[in-house]
Design a protein with these regions (language model features):
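Charged catalytic carboxylate motif
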Residues: 416, 446, 460, 513, ...
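Extracellular/oxidizing-compartment recognition motifs
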Residues: 1-435, 442-443, 457-462, 475, ...
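Amphipathic, well-ordered alpha-helical segments in soluble domains
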Residues: 443, 464, 510-517, 541
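Extended, well-ordered alpha-helical scaffold segments
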Residues: 413, 457-468, 528-545
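Well-ordered alpha-helical scaffold segments within catalytic/enzyme domains
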Residues: 446-457, 513-530
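Short alpha-helical scaffolding segments that buttress acidic/His motifs in well-ordered protein cores
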Residues: 420, 447-448, 464-468
Length: 546
């Protein structure tokens, strides 16, 4: 109906027993988003039902109902123990190329019946893939993602009810270095252990109402696997000859595996993940397969992306297939590594994945890395275009904006902007998906409004701003990169000498993101909660620069 407007709303929240937890009453308002909850404190691990009723200026009403579930809201909710592998990463002066093999963790357990409800809470030091009885728990990538780990480590919640069965079951976690042990992060991790570690807690409800809990403890076992190294910048080395079949399945014989050590890492930095996960958002076929003037095989996917290549392989045992990624070719059409040695930061950013064949047919994609690329040089085999797929990776977000004109040049410009946003919103907002992959604050200062008009970035920015608050120092200084990675304090100090206060590691063109980004969120979405959440951080930054 033309000229229809909301005149009032009523929001109620009840627990599963039907008890009313919150009733806003009828509120005369046109507000329809970011309504603050003003009820009693919610309980951990509880499902709540909410109902919203709205009325318009024509006397019509509409009602909708849904639910949400709380996670572990208190440190005391954790019964699981942190456990780590007996190996350690290389300490001392960090540098590219000092990766360690990924670790396989597993725990076998028995259930008296098939559960009617099962929730698994999990996180790690590194990045992980989670398995239940041989199957992935979900499609997310690079969990628990990039945060200020000492103060803010996300855990993820999984509904694994359908993946469990009566009798023998197994939890498997495949853990790589990720951001946690990446050489970019090591200088800021002095208080943390240089080892892969896991934490998981499985809470089960049986049909008779009884409950059970399976936790990570000294009964978790670990082993090396086929991923001999995995780095977010250098790439992944996978030897299929070292695969351990069915390692994440029930009844696998793990007697030769090593028992894990308990680690006293604590729970004070654990927070349920805010926002959507990193996933594969699109897949691209090979646009063109060519042989370069140098005689090298080049895959062209027709578009610069952030992601990785999935390939089908069927080559003799011991064949080493290498995939090297780049964004442009040289003038002659040869492979060109456009980021190597760029200002020193490109050193070791090989963007190279290696797969060693075991003589069987297989489909491979990297587990713990991603690249910025359009072109891929393939060595070790004569490739077929149909065997390769580019997997576009980004944080999952709802699309909001569109733009179309009669001028195809403008349309292409907007399309390029959207591809750039997709490639640079992966866990944190980055400057580029290949060389630095860093959360430069100045980039989001100038782009946040556009990003919010294109996609629903509310949860994505909320998490990043919480990282910013964690990285803010006692003087109110906001670092130029958030989370503050190891390579960038010195670079920030250099840039601050050029653009800001000498040696402070910050500058108004970057640190102002502490104010501009949350205010942009408020302007675009009407979200006042983000202003309340970030006010102290905003105020301290303003006090510092004044």
């Amino acid at each position: 109906i033309p000229n229809t407007m909301q005149e009032s709303y009523q929001l109620t929240i009840k627990d599963t027993a039907g008890n009313c937890i919150y009733d806003s009453g009828v509120v005369e308002s046109s507000s329809n988003a970011y309504i603050p909850y003003k009820g009693a404190k919610l309980q951990s691990k509880m499902r709540y039902l909410w109902t919203v009723r709205v009325s318009d200026n024509h006397g019509n009403t509409a009602t909708a109902t849904s639910s949400f579930e709380t996670g572990l809201l208190s440190e005391s909710d954790w019964s699981a123990k942190w456990v780590k592998a007996h190996k350690k990463g290389k300490k001392g002066k960090p540098g590219f190329g000092k990766q360690q093999p990924a670790t396989l963790f597993r725990k076998q357990f028995a259930l008296k019946d098939k559960p009617v409800k099962a929730r698994l809470y999990a996180t790690c030091h590194g990045t992980y893939e989670l398995y239940l009885n041989g199957s992935r728990a979900d499609s997310r990538l690079l969990a628990p993602e990039h945060t200020v780990y000492e103060k803010y480590l996300c855990y993820q919640t999984y509904d694994v009810t359908e993946q469990l069965t009566e009798g023998s079951n197994a939890i498997g976690m495949h853990v790589g270095d990720g951001w946690y042990l990446c050489p970019q992060s090591l200088p800021n991790m002095k208080k943390m252990d240089y080892a892969h570690a896991v934490l998981f807690q499985l809470e089960i409800t049986y049909p008779d109402g009884s409950m059970d809990m399976i936790i990570s403890d000294e009964d978790v076992k670990c082993s090396n696997g086929p991923v001999l190294s995995a780095d977010l910048y250098a790439g992944e080395y996978y030897d299929a000859n070292k695969q351990i079949k069915n390692w994440n399945c029930a009844d696998f014989m793990d007697s030769g595996w090593t028992s894990c050590m308990e680690a006293n890492y604590g729970y004070e930095n654990l927070v349920s993940q805010i926002g959507e996960p990193v996933i594969i958002v699109k897949e691209l076929p090979v646009s063109r397969l060519t042989k370069s003037p140098k005689g090298e095989w080049i895959l062209d996917f027709g578009q610069n992306i952030a992601g990785f290549v999935r390939m089908k392989v069927n080559a003799p045992k011991g064949t080493q297939i290498t995939l090297e990624h780049c964004e442009i070719l040289d003038k002659q059409g040869n492979f060109f590594n456009n980021i190597q040695g760029a200002g020193g930061v490109g050193k070791g950013v090989d963007q190279k994945d290696v797969y060693v064949c075991d003589g069987t047919s297989a489909t491979y994609e990297p587990h713990f890395t991603y690249h910025g690329f359009r072109y891929v040089r393939v060595t070790g085999i004569e490739p077929k275009a149909e065997d390769f797929t580019a997997c576009v990776v980004s944080t999952e977000k709802e699309n909001l904006g569109t733009f179309k004109t009669s001028d195809e040049r403008l349309n292409r410009l907007y399309e390029n902007i959207r591809w750039s946003q997709c490639a640079n919103m992966l866990s944190v907002p980055t400057d580029c998906p290949q060389r630095e992959k860093a959360g430069w604050t100045g980039d989001m200062l100038v782009y946040s409004r556009t990003a919010l008009l294109n996609e629903d970035c509310t949860a994505f920015f909320t998490r990043w701003l919480y990282n910013m608050e964690c990285d803010q120092d006692e003087y109110g200084i906001i670092p130029m990169v958030v989370p503050q990675d190891g390579n960038y304090p010195s670079m920030g100090k250099l840039m601050s000498m050029m653009y800001g206060v000498k040696g402070s590691g910050t500058s108004s063109g970057w640190g102002d993101a502490a104010v501009v980004v949350p205010y942009s969120m408020y302007e675009i979405t009407g979200n006042t909660d983000i202003l309340r959440q970030q006010y102290y951080c905003m105020r301290r930054w303003c006090d510092y620069i004044i």
